[in-house]
């Protein structure tokens, strides 16, 4: 177990003394960012229950073209696990294709049985009832020729399913790179134009080609990208919406960036590079050129200088590690252009450099945060020929 730092202990004590019910959106977001899902839900358990007044929130989670990796990430969220978190937030997970037991039952092309046994009937009933949060995992094929028939579940395309589900949703959250902007399924290939995989609100960086736009549905979408998305990003975003700390649509312009990502987790002015555990090697201009080393991974294709996410602060796997710490270069899976913008994944982007600088001189000129902290010292030492 990782021991809590003195600063974090002091911050936790400060937050514990605050009135949860009187927190504005800004204070709430600072609290969830600092504490993480585990500590936040634990610290404010009683207050959360009081705030909810036992009002149940329905959650419908549908799957398009994907690997279910984001659901698996959520299930590996640690303590509290997803079941405990949903219980504390008083969420009724009404539908999730991986976790629910119902199966689609058909007879001569017609749905049979009841919603207790038949997931297709259950979904139709839930759509009619409305008043739910919709989570979408996976991309939506528009091909061939706008039919959406590259993904058909039962006798319905997923494109149709999304349209029906989105129509009566109180809030829509796209989870994972595929649902946000197409992800792996929309990568450049010989068949990409034919399949035409899209995200809920974007296709790569193009909001005009999001599937909701194609369907003529004008509703805001919160994007939680990643391949997979971090469990904290998912749980805390849902928690903020459920608790009314992010009001839709009023608070979204201030809370989200231009691609619909919560600025709290995907800060426009911060990159994974700035808090990378290998940052010290970068500042000294020391780079690994083979896998298995301990130095900066830039020359092995690391994209951390362009990845706007809090991975370096939040960490993964119970807050103990992250890609670069484990020896894997960051592939910037939170970017709308992923994976094409990151390819080739494990080759240095020689024509790009870090923030436009040449990698061979970047440690000497110190960019970004390095110019304010360790980089200033490095520049002075190098200027003296040390």
Swiss-Prot record:
It is a peripheral membrane protein. InterPro entries: Cytochrome-c3_hydrogenase_C, NADH_UbQ_OxRdtase-like_20kDa, NiFe-Hase_small_C_sf, NiFe_Hase_small_N_sf, NiFe_hydrogenase_ssu, TAT_signal, TAT_signal_bac_arc. Its main location: membrane. GO terms for molecular function: 3 iron, 4 sulfur cluster binding; 4 iron, 4 sulfur cluster binding; electron transfer activity; ferredoxin hydrogenase activity; metal ion binding; Methanosarcina-phenazine hydrogenase activity. [4Fe-4S] cluster 2 binds at residues 273, 276, 296, 302. [3Fe-4S] cluster binds at residues 311, 330, 333. [4Fe-4S] cluster 1 binds at residues 67, 70, 178, 227. Binds 2 [4Fe-4S] clusters. Binds 1 [3Fe-4S] cluster. Part of the F420 non-reducing hydrogenase II complex that catalyzes the reduction of methanophenazine to dihydromethanophenazine. Belongs to the [NiFe]/[NiFeSe] hydrogenase small subunit family. This is F420 non-reducing hydrogenase II small subunit. It comes from Methanosarcina mazei (strain ATCC BAA-159 / DSM 3647 / Goe1 / Go1 / JCM 11833 / OCM 88). The lineage of its organism: Archaea, Methanobacteriati, Methanobacteriota, Stenosarchaea group, Methanomicrobia. The gene is vhtG.
């Amino acid at each position: 177990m990782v021991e809590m730092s003195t600063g974090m202990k002091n911050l936790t004590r400060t937050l514990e003394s605050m009135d949860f019910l009187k927190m504005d959106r800004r204070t709430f977001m600072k609290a969830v960012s600092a504490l993480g899902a585990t500590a936040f839900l634990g610290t404010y358990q009683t207050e959360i229950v009081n705030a909810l007044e036992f009002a149940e929130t329905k959650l419908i989670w549908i799957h398009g073209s994907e690997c279910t990796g984001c659901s698996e990430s959520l299930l590996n969220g640690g303590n509290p696990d997803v079941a405990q978190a949903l219980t504390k937030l008083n969420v009724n997970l009404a539908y999730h294709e991986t976790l629910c037991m119902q199966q689609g039952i058909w007879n001569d092309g017609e749905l049979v049985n009841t919603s207790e046994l038949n997931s297709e009937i259950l979904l139709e009933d839930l759509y009619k009832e409305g008043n739910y949060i919709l989570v979408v995992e996976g991309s939506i094929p528009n091909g061939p020729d706008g039919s959406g028939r590259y993904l058909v579940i039962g006798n319905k395309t997923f494109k149709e399913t999304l349209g029906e589900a989105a129509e009566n949703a109180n809030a829509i959250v796209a989870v994972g790179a595929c649902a946000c902007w197409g992800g792996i399924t929309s990568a450049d290939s010989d068949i990409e134009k034919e399949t035409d995989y899209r995200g809920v609100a974007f296709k790569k960086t193009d909001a005009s080609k999001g599937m909701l736009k194609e369907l003529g549905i004008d509703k805001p979408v919160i994007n939680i990208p990643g391949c997979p998305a971090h469990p904290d990003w998912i749980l805390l975003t849902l928690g903020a919406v459920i608790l009314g700390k992010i009001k839709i649509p009023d608070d979204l312009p201030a809370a989200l960036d231009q691609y619909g990502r919560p600025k709290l987790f995907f800060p426009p002015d911060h990159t994974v590079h700035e808090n990378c555990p290998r940052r010290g090697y970068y500042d000294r201009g020391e780079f690994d050129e083979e896998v298995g080393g301990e130095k900066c991974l830039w020359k092995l294709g690391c994209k951390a200088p362009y990845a706007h996410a809090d991975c370096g602060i939040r960490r993964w796997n119970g807050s103990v590690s992250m890609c670069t710490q484990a020896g894997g270069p960051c592939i910037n899976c939170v970017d709308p252009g992923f994976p094409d913008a990151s390819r080739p994944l494990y080759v240095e982007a020689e024509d790009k450099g870090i923030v436009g600088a040449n990698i061979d001189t970047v440690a000497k000129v110190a960019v970004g945060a390095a110019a304010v902290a360790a980089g200033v010292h490095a520049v002075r030492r190098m200027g003296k020929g040390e």
